[in-house]
Amino acid sequence: MTSTPPRWDLTPLYQSIDDPQIGKDLSAAAMQARRFALRGQGKIAAMRPADFGKMIADYDRLNAKTDKVSAFAEMVYTADRADKRNVAFYEKTQARTNAILSKTDFFEAEIADLSDEALNRLMTDETARKYGFWIERVRADRVDLDDKTLAQLDKNAAKTQKALMLYDKTADEIDFTLNGQKTTSSDLYAMAYSADETQRYKAGLAMNDGYKSKADIFASVVNTVAKNKAFSDEKQGFKSPVESRNKSNQIDNAVVSALVSSVDEAMPAVAHRYYALKAKWAGRDKIGYWDRNAPVSGIKPRRYTFDEAKDIVLSAYDSFDKEMGEIARGFFDEKRIDAEPRPNKEPGEYAMPIANGKPYIKMSFGGTTNDVLALAHELGHGIHYELAKKQGSLGMQMPVTTEETASIFGEMLAFDTLLKREKDPKQRFALLSDKMNRVMLTTFRQIALHHYEEDIHNTVREKGAVSVPEINSAWTNAQQKMMGPAVINDERSSSCWADVPHLLKTPFYVYGYAYGECMTSSLYQVYKDGKIADFPKKYKEMLAKGATERPDKLLKPFGLDVSKPDFWKQGLGMMKGYVDRLEQLTPDLTQNRNAAVIKQSRTVGR
């Protein structure tokens, strides 16, 4: 049995990028799209309910057909981005599928514009009711405004897009400098997570200085986006900056408030304590901003072969549920995993859903604990897609609040398996510390970013604009509230708000990560408590529903209510438990610790 990370086999989809079946499938899809438009464009409101139901089902099948070709093209491209034929094939395929689907753009637009009376009449069809939650999401961004206001919204959208392009162009043109040499933000970002403290500090400072040099331009973009959003929200009746995102996520405002307040309340007991422990491990009272994600020094990380990772992950899923274990095993047996690290392969991981086929996984396995957990994470997505594929292409389009449920749950199963198998106290210590680093990023950091966004948008609404010093202050205050007194957070990191442009491109989406992490943690805690009969069966039934129900309804079979702070506190309590265990292990691992670390910290003037 080899331990070489595998390559995937895409031939069950198409034999190669030259497979004539690709052209046949796209031609068939183009014909279907033209017929679809002839049948329905301008006619949706007056349709018979049965015809409306058939239109949705046909729209679903058409999306599934184009999704298959698009998925194949993306997988080929991301597996080797240097192959010019792959690049050309990917670009050509994207252009063709976009052109095909553009013929159907009217459908969602007309559904969004339906009066409530017309929609209620159409929804008497059984097939249409099957797609009820999808229709609800399509209508979430419905705008019922006069023509003058709509025209202004269009103008503002164009201004926002132009401003965001300026943001990207400016960021690309920054001359980042480290040790007198030009470098890139991605290289600096990687060094900011280095085990070498001096390197972390210098890289972080170089990143901050680079963004600071263009802060005035970035601030002008922030103001443009925030002002245009304020206008849009006012005209649509949204009372706070986050409400429009809540509506598109199909989440009540009270649920988001309960999540945010629960995370805020847990910050001292979880985040502050964890960073204080990190300072203690380094032999000091405080650590710097760039030390917050540093790996534990003095402990050699354990390495895993791919076969070992496979065994850990499959054992984790098998121990939870045999059917889920078999679904996971199918990815290995059917060569649906590309885990081989190689040049020109796109960084990162993904699970690719295919409504008319089986999902695939891409990652680059390097043998670290994070790689083992990433494998479990992506297999969780894959299992979710397999169980939900009966819902069709539209029923697999999960909102951000639930799309990470199965992946995080699978990661937790694998983490517990790793922890149970690990007998070395130092390695258990490292496992728990790495886990908490991820929790800080996925939960507490995201809520800090959420507060930063709120501060910026509220300032613009109150004062008409926000200045660079005010943005710096909003950023620093939000980070400090999350990190607590054990982290030094000053002007040396105050311009790093410019490194998160996604907050402008998709405002207020980041709480979705914390929602997913906390919701799944709470669900996992319920599983570990053992009080729910047939938990694995109920869990699989929940996943099999895909995107056909609101997030809050999915948890009803477990007796859980996401609008109650107590729900969120269950998951946050599990995170606190990790910190408790780290505190218990700390005394044995900090004796006679690493004078070199302390000495090094003094050399960089912290």
Region annotations inferred by a language model:
Residues 237, 366-386, 407, 412, ...:
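Active-site recognition of the HExxH zinc-binding catalytic motif
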Residues 1-4, 17, 133-144, 250, ...:
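C-terminal, non-catalytic "cap/extension" segments appended to globular domains
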Residues 315, 319-326, 352, 381, ...:
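Conserved helix-loop functional segments at active or binding sites
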Residues 1-298, 584-591, 595, 604:
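A well-structured
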Residues 276-325, 384, 436-442, 447, ...:
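Long, K/E/R/D-enriched contiguous segments that form extended
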Residues 299-304, 337-357:
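Catalytic zinc-binding patch centered on the HExxH motif and its immediate surroundings
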Residues 301-306, 356-376:
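Short pre-active-site segment immediately N-terminal to the catalytic Zn-binding motif
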